[in-house]
């Protein structure tokens, strides 16, 4: 395991801790730093986790467009990695995002995909 990968994991752990306490700005900062490291290392699995966390923080913060973009990137990576369980979770996240926006048809399409 590389130092950068360990740093990414630690930043995501800290971000999750902040998120669970409702400190969304601090959580976002941790996830954004982790994303920098993940992109540098090219670790796709770490990138999936970090982008998913960023999508979640954007979703609860009302930043639907950013959440959508993060989840879409996660979905593409999960398809490349063959992560069927992860794909299901991400499609549900995308569906929930659209349902929260009142876009029932789009939400349904994600849920059924």
Predicted region positions:
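Short, intrinsically disordered, charge-balanced linker/junction segments flanking boundaries
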Residues: 102-113
């Amino acid at each position: 395991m590389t130092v950068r990968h360990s740093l990414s994991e630690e930043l995501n752990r800290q971000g999750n801790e902040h998120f669970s306490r409702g400190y969304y700005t601090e959580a976002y900062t941790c996830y954004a730093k982790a994303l920098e490291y993940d992109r540098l290392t090219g670790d796709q699995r770490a990138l999936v986790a970090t982008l998913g966390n960023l999508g979640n923080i954007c979703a609860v913060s009302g930043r639907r467009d950013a959440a959508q973009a993060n989840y879409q990137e996660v979905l593409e990576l999960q398809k490349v990695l063959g992560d069927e369980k992860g794909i299901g979770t991400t499609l549900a996240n995308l569906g929930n995002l659209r349902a929260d926006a009142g876009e029932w048809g789009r939400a349904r399409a994600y849920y059924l995909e």
